[in-house]
Amino acid sequence: MAFATRLTVDRAEMVANTSSNTPTLYATLRMDDGARFELIGLHPRPPLPGQSTRSRDANIAQAGARTPDGLSNVLAIGDFNDVPWSKTTARFAREGGYRDPRAGRGSFATFPADYAWVGWPLDQIFVKDGVKVEELVIGDNVGSDHLPLIARVCVDPMSADADIEGLFAPETPAAQGL
């Protein structure tokens, strides 16, 4: 799993929720206006034909159950290898208090990339509290087996955990006088 951002990163860590083979990314990010949110990046292994989905399902369930900084503003994204209407993904959303920004916008099938018009929405995006999705689109084929799911996200600066004054920002070397 790779992680890149233009935003300020207050913290980032990879956690093996169920297996070291399927880590989950947890990061606390800061928008340009200072508003903070936690990011959960998830990509559980897909079950092979005839295999149980238990490992994948456990990874999805555990990923949304915690956020290291305990912020209420959360963006959960990734290739869940699961559809949003499955029991597992529906449970993830329900128990974590997440909203699906696709509601009222369409299913946004991303797999398989070459036949997405008859495909499955395996790539997920969920938000909660002050995190909002302003725009959601399927990107052009970039040579992957999935099409990119592109979201323009904002964080309500008035939300409980926005911290626009930077009270909870980690100290930088410049702030420490180094």
Could you describe each region identified by the protein language model?
Residues 1-178:
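Soluble catalytic domains of enzymes that build or remodel membrane lipids, polysaccharides, and related
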